[in-house]
């Protein structure tokens, strides 16, 4: 859904306004999309109808921060919108965003595999995420698409990502870390 905001921004830049959407309108649209996504997952997307409203510290063993659902939503919105805009701000020069996103996606793919396997999750003291294999397939598709894109985005660039791609990729990274309960790992992996 972040793709629509990015596409509209790119469309405005090409046709009407050279600046595109204002930052406030982008953030407002991202907040609305995040709220709708959170509501949809909370209402329809869960197998056992329970959500763990905790934040897991990836550095300290068995370290959980329990928060209220409202604060959890604010935290989720911060993670998704923050990662989306961080990728958008990074996108600029030839291949500048594709390479790091490939590295971060590979890192998240490995962590997702480990959290989706009961033995590895228990051994490494990770939060077990049942049915994480679907996320692995999605991340593998993103990595493959980015490798293909990087070929044409490297100097001299023939294709540019624009806000359509960068907002989407950042949103994907934010949602993946939320689904695998490794929200605090994203800044570490992206650094």
Regions found by a protein language model. Name each.
Residues 1-4, 37, 43-44, 49-56, ...:
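Alpha-helical transmembrane segments
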Residues 20-24, 62-68, 125-135:
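Interfacial loop-to-helix junctions that mark the boundaries of transmembrane helices
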Residues 4-12, 16:
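Alpha-helical transmembrane segments within multi-pass membrane transporters and channels
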Residues 28-39:
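Carboxylate/His-rich catalytic cores and anion/metal-binding grooves
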Residues 63-81:
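Glycine-rich adenosyl-nucleotide cofactor-binding module
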Residues 15-29:
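Membrane-interfacial loop-to-helix junctions in multi-pass inner-membrane proteins
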Residues 50-68:
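Interfacial loop/helix-cap signal at membrane boundaries in integral membrane proteins
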């Amino acid at each position: 859904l972040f793709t629509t905001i990015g596409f509209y921004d790119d469309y405005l830049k090409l046709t009407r306004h050279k600046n595109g959407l204002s930052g406030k309108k982008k953030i407002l649209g991202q907040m609305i999309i995040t709220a709708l996504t959170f509501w949809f997952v909370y209402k329809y997307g869960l197998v056992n109808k329970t959500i763990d409203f905790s934040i897991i510290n990836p550095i300290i063993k068995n370290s959980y921060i329990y928060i209220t659902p409202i604060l959890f939503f604010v935290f989720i919105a911060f993670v998704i919108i923050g990662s989306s805009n961080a990728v958008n701000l990074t996108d600029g020069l030839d291949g500048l965003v594709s390479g790091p996103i490939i590295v971060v996606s590979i890192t998240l793919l490995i962590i997702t595999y480990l959290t989706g396997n009961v033995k590895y999750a228990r051994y490494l003291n990770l939060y077990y995420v049942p049915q994480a294999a679907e996320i692995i397939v999605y991340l593998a598709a993103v990595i493959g698409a980015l490798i293909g894109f990087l070929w044409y985005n490297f100097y001299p660039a023939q294709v540019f990502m624009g806000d359509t791609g960068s907002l989407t990729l950042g949103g994907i990274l934010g949602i993946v870390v939320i689904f695998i309960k490794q929200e605090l790992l994203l800044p570490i992996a992206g650094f």
